[in-house]
Amino acid sequence: MIEIKGKYGEAKVFTDTLEPSAEGLIKTFCDQPYSAQSKIRIMPDVHAGKGCTIGTTLTVKDAVVPNVVGVDIGCGMLTVKLNEKRIDLPKLDSFIRQNIPCGRDIRERSHRSHGRLDVYELLCVKRVDIRRAKESLGTLGGGNHFIEIDKDDEGNLYLVIHTGSRNLGLRVAQYYQNVAYKACGGRAQAAIPYELAFLQGDAMQYYLHDMEFMQRFAELNRTIIKEVILDGMKLHEEESFSTVHNYIDTENMILRKGAVSAQKGERLLIPMNMRDGSLICTGLGNEDWNFSAPHGAGRLMSRKDALSSFTLNAFKKSMDGIFTTSVTADTIDECPMVYKPMEEIIKNIKETITIEK
């Protein structure tokens, strides 16, 4: 464990290795006056993000920084245990590519289930693209977002869907971070960087309202993808559970940025990488960890560094024996080698979760 102290706050980092850029971001956050009111706990998969670290958890009282929650509000994993023991993987892959838009693509028309949520509930609705929001439901994000089939030691199959709030989450996050920056004095002051500008009072409450809506939007996005795949492939759900990151748990007022809830008895999923799959875990409810766990393995290097460090051939060799059509020159930045080893993460999370499988 590493402890970092700033001018006002201090943080515990639950790992023994920390890159300098991540340490600097944590120190800068702890130098902000509002950090004094928060219990800051950083997860083992910590790595540098834009203005703050991925893997951050903190208690929230009278101030909130929208950028710390991030632009993909409510992103998470939906884990669906299937009744089937065998699946035609090439057929599934082809079906997903034909029916689930991904990356920058959206649907040509809104999915029939878009009416389960009313975008006009957003208080900042005038600042977003409503048509694009509706047509984004049932779509997969780019980068490290994925749809995969995992198999446990007993032969059970799991459909795992990792995606979030798409362009709508970005628009909402950017709007409220701009509001925060203006409220803090904008360019007329130099003490608070744009990325760490904060909201208080009514503005904070407005943000919390819209942030909660975005969590429901992201959840519906994953649900629609699940329904499209199960219906189209004639698959059957036995049970399912969700594991969310990039949000504020408003019941307990805990912010999790690239971290997940691990309350006592709570089931959660921690994905490792494209090769090693995921861990199904149960939370231990450790208060010192802010009742949290890491949301993944955490990157060892930036996407730019990954593209220059590994070849497509090395990527292909690392995925030997695993069916995928996603091993290309464009996805080298997501190869297994750019993530921290699974053993390192497992070693550091025993105090907050138990691993089921």
Predicted feature residues:
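Acidic low-complexity segments
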Residues: 98-124
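Acidic/polar active-site rim loop that often engages polyanionic ligands
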Residues: 73-82
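Domain-length cofactor-binding catalytic modules of enzymes
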Residues: 2-28, 35-42, 48-54, 63-66, ...
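Glycine-rich phosphate/pyrophosphate-binding loop regions near the starts of catalytic domains
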Residues: 57-58
